[in-house]
Amino acid sequence: SEMCIRDRLVTVLLGILIFIDDYFNCLTVGSVMRPVTDKHNVSRAKLAYLIDATAAPICIIAPISSWAAAVTGFVEGEDGFEIFIKAIPYNYYALFTIAAMILIVALNVDFGSMAVHEANAAKGDLYTTPDRPYANATEDVIKGRGRVLDLLFPIITLIVCCIIGMLYSGDFFKGVGFVDAFSGSDASVGLMLGSFFALIITIVFYAVRRVLSFNESCSCIPEGFKAMVPAILILTFAWTLKAMTDSLGAKEFVAGLVKGVSGGWLSILPAVIFLVAVFLAFATGTSWGTFGILIPIVVSTFSGTNHTMMIISISACMAGAVCGDHCSPISDTTIMASAGAQCNHMNHVSTQLPYVIVVAVISCVTYVIAGFVQNPIIPLIIGLSLIHI
């Protein structure tokens, strides 16, 4: 129905708006949109897909995000933030996932097991399978005074504060130009400062509005820290893996192999890197760990030789990591999307997989083309055309 399409589009829009962090995205979009989509008979599996498809794919192409900070931290000997920006047009999996999701929602089409879930939801069964996680749970109502502003204000404040924080870390307030300050910023420092001040402002805002008292707001902080512990551990282990591969000389070994490869075979390297990243992220369930292993190898392989090919290959690594993470049943983001939608986890994985495979195949084809043309536009147009077909 028209109401269902509108609800899905609002879910997508909210997911795109919350690009700072994928955990924050999954939990916020899920808790906000779940009562609305339930009311208009959107299956929990479809909601989980919409949440998951606007989490990592949005964060990996957003310069102001925890993912950008993680990626730039793995790029050594180069301007990590500048490379991240240049890699965005080549991040085909993320771009095609967002495009495919919008097309699916706008045209109201589904295929595979998702079509079964949506057909059952139209009859009032939002779960399809007997397992109904949180079926008897009641939605937490914190205060009756809550308004739309209470949701939008913290998000907008967080984005603005993070931008200011990144400009500050890039010495913008010491006379450096806007673009130079942004490209020369330390994303991790900027996000940390921005998040801290956004938290303070939000606590004061809620206290003034009498939505949450100071004590109630402060009691939420430990819960927030707990939610981020898995991400902190993943990043720590990713850095450990990076140090181990560095010690083993993996970068030099791969660089030596690639230098012996002739031009034609070199052009398909981005597609190979994409596939390796997909399988590595799928097996480990972590895209950040995949970044930590592959990005330093890619940088050392192409550094000082073919800068464009390095950017395409780094982007292929990021896209493949997100793709593998997207369909892995042990991925933290996939688990968070299931939790946000309160959907059976394996239902979410099985219904999302056909969509992921279609976009992954198209992305792999576009990386083969990108390796030869070394231009982001032509493969992008071809990929979008294939999605539309």
What residue ranges belong to the model's regions?
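Short amphipathic alpha-helical coupling elements at transmembrane boundaries
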Residues: S31-K39, Y49, K86, E216-A227, ...
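Short, small-residue-biased leader/transition segments that mark boundaries at the very start
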Residues: E2-I5, I389
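Juxtamembrane and boundary regions of transmembrane helices in multi-pass small-molecule transporters
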Residues: I58-A137, M318-I387
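C-terminal transmembrane helix pair
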Residues: V229-L233, F237-L241, T245, S262-F291, ...
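Long, contiguous bundles of hydrophobic transmembrane helices that form the permeation core
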Residues: T97-G184, F196-C220, G340, N344-L353, ...
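Alpha-helical transmembrane segments of multi-pass membrane proteins
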Residues: R6-I20, G30, H40-W67, F81-A99, ...
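Interfacial loop-to-helix junctions that mark the boundaries of transmembrane helices
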Residues: I83-N91, V176-G194, K259-G264, F372-I381
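Core transmembrane alpha-helical segments of multi-pass membrane transporters/permeases
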Residues: S1, I16, G146-I155, V160, ...
